[in-house]
Swiss-Prot record:
Disulfide bonds: none annotated. Keywords: Endoplasmic reticulum, Membrane, Transmembrane, Transmembrane helix. It is found in: Endoplasmic reticulum membrane. GO terms for biological process: protein insertion into ER membrane by stop-transfer membrane-anchor sequence; tail-anchored membrane protein insertion into ER membrane. The chain crosses the membrane at residues 64-84, 96-117, 125-145. It is a multi-pass membrane protein. Part of the endoplasmic reticulum membrane protein complex (EMC) that enables the energy-independent insertion into endoplasmic reticulum membranes of newly synthesized membrane proteins. Preferentially accommodates proteins with transmembrane domains that are weakly hydrophobic or contain destabilizing features such as charged and aromatic residues. Involved in the cotranslational insertion of multi-pass membrane proteins in which stop-transfer membrane-anchor sequences become ER membrane spanning helices. InterPro entries: TMEM85/Emc4 (IPR009445). This is ER membrane protein complex subunit 4. It comes from Xenopus laevis. GO terms for cellular component: EMC complex; endoplasmic reticulum membrane; membrane. Component of the ER membrane protein complex (EMC).
Length: 180
């Protein structure tokens, strides 16, 4: 007849998930016998395995982050166009504040360009990313200047600069459908 230890040994071999807690003491892994090795899962190793996929995925994430920084100003242009449309061409405090902020953000970004280029140093395409960043900010600044010109805030006539020159006379007046 089978002894209880043989049953436990056979059970341990047959069911690898069964663990015998009754025998053994506080011995280390190197001192354990063949029976105690069944306590560790299949494929367990004491050695550390180097993972090269982590380094590769980190490089991909750095490139992606650098492109996000470079494309940031270009992503703001549709919102700036919407703000330009909503502000209208009238001169009041809110449209002027919106236009000033629209022009100030690219100026701030252009002044902080060296700090931004430091973030792009780890990228392999830093020249192209820096160029895209610069073009995006210049386009944002051009939108702000265009909006200032369409609101009449930029001096475009000689009478804007000199007090003794009369402003140009309008050739035509419209009144919105009312007879004047």
């Amino acid at each position: 007849m089978a002894t209880p230890t043989n049953l436990v040994t056979n059970r341990g071999r047959r069911f690898k998930w069964a663990i015998e807690f009754g025998s053994g003491g506080s011995r280390g892994r190197g001192e354990r016998g063949g029976l105690q090795d069944s306590m560790y899962p299949v494929g367990y190793s004491d050695k550390q395995v180097p993972d090269t996929s982590v380094q590769e995925s980190d490089h991909i994430l750095v490139e992606k982050r650098c492109w996000d920084i470079a494309l940031g100003p270009l992503k703001q242009i549709p919102m700036n166009l919407f703000i330009m449309y909503m502000a209208g061409n009238t001169i009041s405090i809110f449209p002027i504040m919106m236009v000033c902020m629209m022009a100030w953000r690219p100026i701030q970004a252009l002044l902080a360009t060296p700090a931004t280029f430091k973030l792009l140093e780890s990228s392999g395409q830093r020249f192209l990313q820096g160029l895209v960043y610069l073009i995006g900010n210049l386009l944002g600044l051009a939108l702000g200047v265009y909006k200032c010109q369409s609101m009449g805030l930029l001096p475009t006539h000689a009478s804007d600069w000199l007090a003794f020159i009369e402003p140009p006379e309008r050739m035509e007046y419209t009144g919105g459908g009312f007879l004047l």
